[in-house]
Amino acid sequence: MATTVVAPPGAVSDRANKRGGGPGGGGGGGGARGAEEESPPPLQAVLVADSFNRRFFPISKDQPRVLLPLANVALIDYTLEFLTATGVQETFVFCCWKAAQIKEHLQKSKWCRPTSLNVVRIITSELYRSLGDVLRDVDAKALVRSDFLLVYGDVVSNINVTRALEEHRLRRKLEKNVSVMTMIFKESSPSHPTRCHEDNVVVAVDSATNRILHFQKTQGLRRFSFPLSLFQGSGAGVEIRYDLLDCHISICSPQVAQLFTDNFDYQTRDDFVRGLLVNEEILGNQIHMHVTTREYGARVSNLHMYSAVCADVIRRWVYPLTPEANFTDSTAQSCTHSRHNIYRGPEVSLGHGSILEENVLLGSGTVIGSNCSITNSVIGPGCCIGDNVVLDRAYLWKGVQVASGAQIHQSLLCDHAEVKEQVTLKPHCVLTSQVVVGPNITLPEGSVISLHPPDAEEDEDDGQFSDDSGVNQAKEKAKLKGYNPAEVGVAGKGYLWKAADMNTEKEEELRQSLWGLTINEEEESETESERSMDSEELDSRAGSPQLDDIKVFQNEVLGTLQRGKEESISCDNLILEINSLKYAYNISLKEVMQVLSHVVLEFPLQQMDSPLEANRYCALLLPLLKAWSPVFRNYIKRAADHLEALAAIEEFFLEHEALGTCIAKVLMGFYQLEILAEETILSWFGQRDVTDKGRQLRKNQQLQRFIQWLKEAEEESSEDD
């Protein structure tokens, strides 16, 4: 199902004529010049108004990420203002999750007025599951006619892409359309607050042409491997850069959408970049980069980035996108600016003795009691703050009520949340819409409270991408289930997002996903972690056709390897068969690695009727690893791939505890066959966020001896260097 907001007839062409002086020009010789040099077509943009991940759950269970208010303005409004300011005249907004809310917001905004310089067309579908699906739809509908900008709806930027666009077009003109994408980066030190650890990248680039030669997410690693071929034969030299912030803004040729159609395993932009760099010699396509030093660009991928970008807006680093500029033309968002970055909306009341220290935004109609201390905080419209309240790096959305004596530190309170008397919120707490906490309670650091009970999440997962996916069922369950006063206070309303069987690891995982406190090997992206869905997201799709496809794909891979062993089929042909299965079942690269690792480790068990003891299992497995090592090396290339394979190996040995004693031999086999690198094995072994069983597995004496041997080998290698 798809809907489109149709622009006024001739709107794009009329506006293009106005910008270009109209048909025929305004003076003698205009027609001749037009004949000699055709003016570029109107600039288009593809705006993806969905992240295709759950990084903002449970906040985004109530409203989509692109409508979350940042400094009291919806995120998508920042993105559209950036696109319009940079010269975009037509934007296709693709929506999936909560599409009706996004559509309603846009239709009421200035972007859908006849006078808008940027014609916004809204396309909705419940079938989109990734950026790849969106771009395949762009190609199927033939929406883009020339180079276009590709952005997510949570990008905040003031970058003028004109120069980058000119460079991109010139490259394509001189090199016969070889360059298909220009990625925009901002020069930024690794310690900068707006550097999102999950998006940190190391880039190898041709010094003369800015052509990207290698692109790798750091995944928390400190050492990286680069193909030797990068440094051979490059006349101008190669730069290795770790001082870049990915703005998630890309200039794309129409070929990009076509390449996503041709490669169904491309789900994210990272998949696309990786695929093109790996196959550059075969496909002949190149990717370039443009680096800005003074302008601003960032993506709000988690609450850490939300806090950092919001602070930058308040501190005026994103000028001219400042709160008092009111670029949305909404009377409700008008405000004044004074010293120390204090912004006040209309009809704000400030009680006696209350202090607004610095970097504070007060929304319209907000009432603040006496003797309050507020610093580095944003308060939405219609909020009511009691007496003696302390707000430090607090983000309050519309209609929030905070009673007297409350203290809120580095936390987020969504629409119409209520904090009772004498409540303290430690850092990184989240109260979603209409939650009530208190009185006289302290919420520990990282507490997430929602009116949606966590155990209702699984019931909603089957329809998680539709507008009303089980919401009514969840509310009914909430009515039947009482709130826990120990968690939310005697007058509280809400559920601590901790199911009865959720262990400490999963609680930490929830905090990480919201605030991005630690490295998450997954995203990307998409989450922009963005390569593919993690195991939790796969679980959430129980009963979906995709899971059935993965099971069928696993059986097909098993059959392929069995036939390969029996008929001595070459590894090159096995790779071709696995690739054809991958395309047939629309399986992501990560899922291929998971399935391949699982199938090969299970293979000796599949061939025997009786249980195998550890030594016999190793004797059967290691020759298979040697025979199929080229297949593994074909799919395990990046550091993230190594860690995914190690996670699959760990999962196998946790499921088969009787074989646990031979994990060291298996890892040694992977290492000696150059499938897994020593630094990634050490990184995996040193992971702190593991289950009790995972910790027990790491206490295996043979495994610890192997790890010690690896460390000594690494130290000897470093000394030799």
From Swiss-Prot:
Location of Phosphothreonine modifications: T322
Boundaries of every W2 domain copy: 543-720
Modified residues (Phosphoserine): S130, S450, S466, S469, S532, S540, S544, S717
InterPro entries with a match to the protein in the record: ARM-type_fold, eIF-2B_epsilon_N, eIF2B_epsilon, Nucleotide-diphossugar_trans, Trimer_LpxA-like_sf, W2_domain, W2_eIF2B_epsilon
Residue numbers carrying N-acetylalanine: A2
Acidic residues bias locations: 456-465
Basic and acidic residues bias locations: 528-540
Post-translational modification: Phosphorylated at Ser-544 by DYRK2; this is required for subsequent phosphorylation by GSK3B. Phosphorylated on serine and threonine residues by GSK3B; phosphorylation inhibits its function. Polyubiquitinated, probably by NEDD4.
PROSITE patterns in the cross-refs: W2 (PS51363)
Glycyl lysine isopeptide (Lys-Gly) (interchain with G-Cter in ubiquitin) crosslink residues: K61, K103, K141, K217
GO biological process, one term: ovarian follicle development
Annotated keywords: Acetylation, Cytoplasm, Initiation factor, Isopeptide bond, Methylation, Phosphoprotein, Protein biosynthesis, Ubl conjugation
Expression tissues: Ubiquitously expressed.
Composition-biased stretches (Gly residues): 19-33
Transmembrane segment boundaries: none
Segments of this protein annotated with the region Disordered: 1-40, 446-478, 517-545
CDD domains, A to Z: eIF-2B_epsilon_N (cd04197), W2_eIF2B_epsilon (cd11558)
Localization of this protein: Cytoplasm, Cytosol
Any Gene Ontology CC annotation: cytoplasm
Pfam families per the UniProt record, alphabetical: LbH_EIF2B, W2
Entry-linked PANTHER family: TRANSLATION INITIATION FACTOR EIF-2B SUBUNIT EPSILON
Subunit and partners: Component of the translation initiation factor 2B (eIF2B) complex which is a heterodecamer of two sets of five different subunits: alpha, beta, gamma, delta and epsilon. Subunits alpha, beta and delta comprise a regulatory subcomplex and subunits epsilon and gamma comprise a catalytic subcomplex. Within the complex, the hexameric regulatory complex resides at the center, with the two heterodimeric catalytic subcomplexes bound on opposite sides.
Function summary: Acts as a component of the translation initiation factor 2B (eIF2B) complex, which catalyzes the exchange of GDP for GTP on eukaryotic initiation factor 2 (eIF2) gamma subunit. Its guanine nucleotide exchange factor activity is repressed when bound to eIF2 complex phosphorylated on the alpha subunit, thereby limiting the amount of methionyl-initiator methionine tRNA available to the ribosome and consequently global translation is repressed.
Family according to the record: Belongs to the eIF-2B gamma/epsilon subunits family.
Protein name: Translation initiation factor eIF2B subunit epsilon
